[in-house]
């Protein structure tokens, strides 16, 4: 009998590993995807990773009608396939230690850790490189649905001072791996560097099928111990650069907070930008990390209070049932009646992110029992 290939450790509440799986990196990314029903992403590193990977960030209800590729014999075949498309790379940073960029696929790293905490809805990873311990933690807020938080910690491991430089990027130069004609589905409408950070406004490209074009605005603001150095805009990206010296026996924190708004909730580009700015000023900029984090933990605790299934004496089964519930609730929790249950959640592009009748038929009873009645 074939043995199960297990790349993640068994733990009742976590999907975790102490190995960076170069050969199975895509699988690791799928297993550590997170979301909040409004948006989500695969478990990609924020830092540069030049190895094989599938970068993916998705917004629920934001899609594009990709023209089908089909031979002449397929009479009656649909003209397009609706896809929940890869939106922006909002997690991206270029991390330099002592003027050399960190590439996790190339650099010799040690003490690697990776953990999706399903109880709290957070993903964390860490590693040692060039005399520095790097610790990353992220979550897609279950309290402020438009907010994703990325925190990076740096701890000196030797008696040397290290210069840490971080270029934080929002990048629209993204693709869908399953695009039928290798098209990029996004065009940039607007971009700006501001006192608190930067924003990038994009729109899905025009299509010949009369389907609406979606506008998406992503902004980044920052907190922590780093000094702002410079800002830049490029054709398809915005960048904010921060840096400081990490002294021996000390530690530093850098926070990247991303707010994403779309034309699903606002009338036009100006309104999407204004709505984004309002969320940043009213709900994000003055909040300490611990406040944002605690709101996340509290929101997920309420979900688990209703939904948790306890299995004694079988940790693998316990992990499995919680993983399924976590991914379901990360995908859809009923807050937006316009949305539905994507069969693969925010783990990637399989099935185009569309919902199928069998997903509905089998999942609705679960949601009726474990979420608010308005879920349907």
Can you say where each PLM-predicted feature lies in the sequence?
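Short, surface-exposed helix-loop/turn micro-motifs enriched in polar/charged residues
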Residues: 338, 354, 374-375
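Carboxylate/His-rich catalytic cores and anion/metal-binding grooves
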Residues: 314-322, 363-376
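Acidic/polar, glycine-enriched structural segments that form the non-catalytic walls/loops
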Residues: 2-350
